Amino acid sequence: MPQANVNTTPTSHTLPFRAADFTTLTEALDYAAQGETGSNFYTGRGAIYASLSYAELRAQALDLAHKLLGLGLDKGDRVALVAETNPDFIRFFYACQYAGLIPVALPASVKVGAHCAYVAQLHLLLEA
């Protein structure tokens, strides 16, 4: 759903380019968070509905990482994530990385209007 007054993140920044010299994905995000760029999210009709700077992503992912570990998850545990192209997926994916958890991306439902039923089905499968 499009939101009014969503500003896109810039496409250029002043950070020096670093090619493949990061040892972890979180190290790369830590570096990118020093700049101004980020990710923009669009509807199927091309309207922006959310933006997330890498600095915001890093802060939110670190907060979520602490919350996930606070639920009793241990490093190395797997966390199922429905792989949708939205800010929550990216937040939780990076939260898992920071917490030492293994994000397991599950395919998103392709049926229009079937999201809730699909998530319920995944929940039953994961509990089995």
Residue ranges of each PLM-predicted region?
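Short amphipathic alpha-helical segments and helix-helix/interface helices
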Residues: 29, 93, 122-126
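Glycine-rich phosphate/diphosphate-binding loops that line cofactor/substrate pockets in enzymes
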Residues: 33-34, 68-73, 123
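Acyl-group handling in specialized metabolite and lipid biosynthesis
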Residues: 13-21, 44-50
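Structural core segment of the AMP-binding/adenylate-forming
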Residues: 70, 98-128
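Conserved long hydrophobic alpha-helices within structured protein cores
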Residues: 30-40, 91-107
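A short N-terminal helical cap/helix-turn-helix that marks the beginning
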Residues: 2-4, 18-41, 59
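Conserved AMP-binding/adenylate-forming core of the ANL superfamily
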Residues: 40-94, 111-118
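Eukaryotic N-terminal low-complexity, Ser/Thr- and Lys/Arg-rich leader segments
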Residues: 2-13
